[in-house]
Amino acid sequence: DKRFNINTKVIYNPLNKSEIKILGHKKFKFTFFDGAKIKAINIARFTDQKDHMTLLKAILILIKKKINIKLLIMGYGTNKHKIQNFISKNKISKNVKIINFQKNPYKFLKKSNLFILTSLYEGLPNVLLEAMVLKKYIISSNCPTGPKEILANGKFGSLFKTQDIKDLSNKILDFNYNVYKNNKIIHNASKSLTRFDFNTNCEEYFKIIKKFI
C-alpha cells in the first residue's frame, strides 16, 4: 500500500482446474435440459443474499416471450419454500427445476450452457471460476465484490445491474441471439484463468513463506 510504503502482492485462491474438468466429465443420466436452447444453471444457497427472486422473475419474462429456456437451481436454505411457491404459483415447473446441493455439482454444470449469478454481494465467488473452467457463458450481477473483477468488467461475461429484472432478462436474450460472440467470450474467459492456476499460485505462496523462514 503506497500510503504506508508497504509492498503488496495479490495471490488468488488456487483453482484446481484439472479436478473440476475430471468431475465435470463424469457421465450420468440427466434429461431435464433436453430440448432446451438455453440451459441455464444457478448454484447458490437459498438465502436473501443470493436473490433468487430476481432470477426467477427474469426467467418468467422469457418464458412468457416463448423463449426456449430451462433453468436448474441447485442449493439449500431457508428460502427454498419461497422459491418453490413462486415456481408453483406461476406454473413454470416444466422450465424451472430445484435440486439440493450435490457432492459433484460439476457434472450438472457441464450439462448447462449458461451460468447465472444474481447475488446482492459476494467475496470472490469461486462458482464463477468453476463455470469458466467448464467453458460456460456467465451472466452475473455487478455486485460488490468479485464478479466485476473475475469477468474483467464484462470482457469475460455479462454483468447486469443488481436486482434489475429487466436488465437480466435482456442479457439472457443477448446470450440467446449471439452465439458467435458468446463462443469468443467463453474462449477468452477460459484463457484468463491463468490468474487462478493451482500450481502457479501455490508456488507464489511458497515463495512468500520462504522469505520468513
Each model region followed by its residue ranges:
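Aromatic "clamp/platform" in nucleotide-sugar-dependent glycosyltransferases that forms part
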Residues: F101, L120
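Carbohydrate-associated surface elements
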Residues: P14
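Short hydrophobic beta-strand element within catalytic cores of glycosyltransferases
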Residues: Y137-S141
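A charged, aromatic-enriched C-terminal amphipathic alpha-helix characteristic of glycosyltransferases
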Residues: Y180-K210
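Conserved acidic donor-binding segment of nucleotide-sugar-dependent glycosyltransferases
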Residues: N153-I165, D174-V179
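Short acidic/histidine- and often glycine-rich active-site loop of Leloir-type glycosyltransferases
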Residues: E130, C143-G154, S158-L159
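A structural motif in glycosyltransferase catalytic domains
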Residues: A40, L55-I59, L71, L168, ...
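A conserved mid-protein helix/loop that constitutes part of the nucleotide-sugar donor-binding site
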Residues: I38, R45-K64, T78-Q84, N126
